[in-house]
Amino acid sequence: MPPPNVNRMARYLAILFTLGAGLVGCSEAPDTPSPASPTAQPPAPTTAQLSPGGAQPRLAADPVRLAQDLIADERALRDASTPEAVLKQAARRQQVAYRAIGRHPEWDAIIRPVLPAELIPFYDRNVDARRQLAKLAEPRDTLPAWRINPPPPAQALLTAYRDAEAASGVGWNYLAAINLIETHFGSVTGDSAAGAQGPMQFMPSTFAAYGKGGDIHSPRDSILAAGNYLAANGFAHNPDHALFRYNNADAYVRAVTDYAAAMAADPAAFGVFYRWDVYYVTTAGDVLLPVGYAAESPIPVGEYLTAHPQ
């Protein structure tokens, strides 16, 4: 049995995102439909920008109003006529809304009943994923020594996921979900405390065994290696076991399953997640790390927030 690829970036972090922080679990994970082709228009390439500063989108304080705004954003994200700039802003607000709802289970009885039926599965999977990731988050008093770059083009990622699926039998949506949680599709550049590297956060020794001579920092090579690793750990017969071997946390397994199910069922989901921001969980709350963020060493969170108010 291959050695588990543990102590990935999310452990060190307290991150992300999708994330906002972390990783996931296994109780009553939703059934995942057969992977559907992501037919929505792939997002336009992301361009680096530090202004308007990475300030977080503002949400309504009232959960009823928040629900109304979330419905409007969800509909815009599924409307083929929505301009890219509007899609980006809707996705950013949606992400922050799910992060807030994840922290407030008392809002469930207010928000969920007013959602249109067609949005409930996507809502449920996102809220559950957030709560699972929160179990793995350890708020830090410093921001990480990372760089945040634009992710690779969406179509290049989708091609890599599909090629890995064809080679390994592991669903493209599971590979995309792991890529989302680990490094926001490769936006995050930085090693974990344990030494995990690259867009799929492999330990070098594990990548050497499953990467077939590829480059651990290559998005395509690391995605293909992840498919090989999961297949070798019995993904075809027991996906939960294989995902647990990838990162030894039940909450991680459940979050990956949630995001994978969302992408399999909803053609808009991948584009939505691709447009999300990178967040880091700190003792001062969630901090948005914009494209262009770069630190050679950890930065005290208070110092960063003074210069970059959220």
Where are these regions (language model features)?
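Intrinsic disorder/low-complexity detector
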Residues: 12, 43-49, 53
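Sec-dependent N-terminal signal peptides
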Residues: 13-19
